[in-house]
């Protein structure tokens, strides 16, 4: 069976708040503590170091929290993920390495401690909140002094229309050369 839930997620509320590097751990902690009722919190961070810093701030509350990123050993990552999915951890601070294939329906809040790489990333990551249909919140924290530089770096990473055209032309030539019928599927991240 295939079910289409549509794109509208009326159970999610969104807000954004300015933050500085110094005030960020406190604001993340306040946001997590202010959550009403049971459920988990997910804090997305841009770097491994920042996940460690946010997890330490949450653990100091004290709160059952841990960091999750690709730099952790495989066993540690599996344990953190298992503890989070089972409810032994109420909060996790993670890079975008967390998420693909992870289904935890009771995430009550997703906090972006850093501005994500793209709007698509933000929507996908924020969409991990409230998958059970219950109310959930999505909060984006941003450092006003770093916004301009962030978007300049992002714009430099984008392919130009001309470069995309070259890629498509090369793919078409490849398809003709190998005499393949059907479609060529390309994923660009």
What feature does the model see in each segment?
Residues 1-189:
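Helicase motor core with emphasis on the C-terminal RecA-like subdomain
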């Amino acid at each position: 069976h295939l079910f289409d839930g549509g794109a509208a997620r009326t159970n999610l509320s969104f807000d954004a708040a300015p933050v500085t590097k110094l005030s960020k751990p406190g604001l993340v902690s306040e946001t997590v503590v202010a959550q009403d009722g049971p459920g988990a919190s997910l804090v997305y961070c841009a770097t491994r170091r920042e996940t460690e810093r946010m997890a330490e701030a949450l653990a100091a509350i004290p709160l059952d929290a841990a960091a999750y990123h690709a730099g952790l050993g495989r066993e540690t990552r599996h344990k953190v993920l298992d503890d989070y999915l089972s409810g032994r951890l109420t909060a996790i601070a993670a890079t975008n390495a967390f998420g693909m294939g992870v289904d935890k329906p009771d995430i009550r809040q997703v906090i972006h401690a850093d501005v994500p790489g793209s709007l698509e990333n933000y929507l996908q990551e924020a969409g991990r909140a409230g998958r059970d249909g219950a109310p959930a919140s999505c909060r984006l924290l941003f450092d006003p002094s770093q916004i301009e530089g962030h978007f300049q770096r992002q714009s430099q990473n984008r392919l130009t229309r001309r470069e995309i055209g070259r890629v498509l032309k090369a793919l078409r030539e490849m398809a003709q050369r190998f005499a393949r019928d059907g479609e060529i599927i390309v994923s660009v991240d």
